[in-house]
Amino acid sequence: MASDRQNLQDAFLNHVRKTKVPVTIFLINGVKLQGVITWFDNFCVLLRRDGQSQLVYKHAISTIMPAQPISLYEGEDAN
């Protein structure tokens, strides 16, 4: 069933959240935010840095770039 499958956005955000990979978030107005994603839902992302949390609305996000390469694929051919 299609509803049982996780979409790419959720898989990506969940992976960087669980592994605590630092990310850089670029907003559509050009602002650059850096930190660790601690929580997310359909509408927003909670970003933590230096003990402070920022609630960032997804509609304002242009790009999320992890600080290191990540692999979402867990099959035999994963590199």
From Swiss-Prot:
GO terms for cellular component: cytosol. Keywords: RNA-binding, Stress response. GO terms for molecular function: RNA binding. Coiled coil: none annotated. SUPFAM superfamilies: Sm-like ribonucleoproteins. Residues 10-70 form the Sm domain. It holds the Pfam family Hfq. CDD domains: Hfq. GO terms for biological process: regulation of DNA-templated transcription; regulation of RNA stability; regulation of translation, ncRNA-mediated. Belongs to the Hfq family. Homohexamer. RNA chaperone that binds small regulatory RNA (sRNAs) and mRNAs to facilitate mRNA translational regulation in response to envelope stress, environmental stress and changes in metabolite concentrations. Also binds with high specificity to tRNAs. This is RNA-binding protein Hfq. It comes from Ruegeria pomeroyi (strain ATCC 700808 / DSM 15171 / DSS-3) (Silicibacter pomeroyi).
